[in-house]
């Protein structure tokens, strides 16, 4: 098995404990592992809300235990039902407390619910009739004002392009298409080409690539 050096690596999408499902590491274990391999930064993510307060404690722990190591843990917010969905008040607090990444709905995205055989009407709506819902304008403004990263999370490819076009028009500079190869998102190769053509960043997760490779192709050319 090949071993790849991890020094200087930045991972913007890591789930840790505590969580509603068991993860491989808790926050402090991840901090120790990151410092050990010389990682530069990690963004911790949760489907249940925010992690910027946890990231703050990780950085305090790192300084006390490891000294002035060149590693920073960053926090984020996911706009699922626990924070009120597209809730600008919750988002602004998270950004003021240091959240650097804003994910659109994940487990509560309408696309996610539909893919798991649940009622999409129970989800958080981000587009309607080919346009963003009005609440998204406040989300874009806050992301722009705080120069945060906006991730498309578990919304559909069609929704992603609508959202990204509108976000760009609103002045959002940092846009990431989240694990587009994962079967829940299921962006086609042509969709990925379009993303690259519009200079959108795409995030590819090891777990999603492994999971997708074990599945039958889902409409990809």
Model-assigned labels for residue ranges:
Residues 17-19, 49-53, 80-83, 109-112, ...:
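Active-site environment of divalent metal-dependent phosphoester hydrolases
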Residues 22-33, 84-94, 188, 220:
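Short, acidic/polar
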Residues 22-26, 50, 86, 131-135, ...:
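Short secondary-structure boundary/capping elements
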Residues 102, 135, 142, 150, ...:
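Active-site-adjacent C-terminal substructures of enzyme catalytic domains
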